[in-house]
Amino acid sequence: MKIKNTLFSLITVTVMTIGTVNAIETIVIKGSDTLGAKMVPQIAEAFKAKMNKQGVEVAFEIAAEGSSTGVASVIDATAEIGMSSRDPKDKEVAKAKAKGVDMKAITMAKDGIAIIVNESNFIESISLEEIELIFSGDVTDWSGITAQTGEISAYTRNTSSGTYAVFQKLGMNSRDYGVDSQKMAGNEQIAAEVANNPNGIGYVGLAYIKTPGVKVLPVDGSMPEDPSYPIARPLYYLSDNSKQLSPLANDFIGFSMSPEGQNIVNRVNFLSIY
């Protein structure tokens, strides 16, 4: 009987040890579509491959639902890492503090918000003033800023998007969007609509400027990759600084900042932090 109990104990310890070795940790990341649709998933895949070579299995749950979701996910502790293409708002910071959350924003890349039109459009450049006129609804026909005619279809992000707020501030002088502007869920949807509409105009992150059927307009003579480009912003990881990140989540953020991670940032047409 003693032998059987000893054998059972050995088997139990062995099974528990194997279970510990093979346990897969899942890193939950939520927020900005600008970060979460292409860039962060590609960084995550590279990180997984690196960890696998070290015998560590890691999985990711990435939800690209807008910057507001990213901020809320850190406040509500539904994600270990948030993603945002804008600074947290004062009311969000206040809500975080009320819940004991010390919101930390880590710049992991930079992005220019590109103005795109259909490739058949004759317009070759645009000014900040003209952008404001179009997206505020003051100009609704191309004849208002060019020699061509046609009713303008202006495509924007939805209100939960950080890009929506940043563009409103930097591209529209903080004016309200026009009532006829069409709100889209993500960059990909805006690019697709503009590609299919000869009178379309919209704004997207740099990862989407090579969408077939669209072209990028210089703004006041500068392209989105230029240091002088007027509609540019940092892209953030968010975390709760009052809590210690899991070792793997911390390593993932470090990997994102490493030369290998920043090479991926550049590869998907965003701008590295150095």
Predicted regions and their residues:
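Bacterial N-terminal signal peptides that target proteins for export
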Residues: 1-8
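Exported/periplasmic ABC-transporter solute-binding proteins
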Residues: 23-274
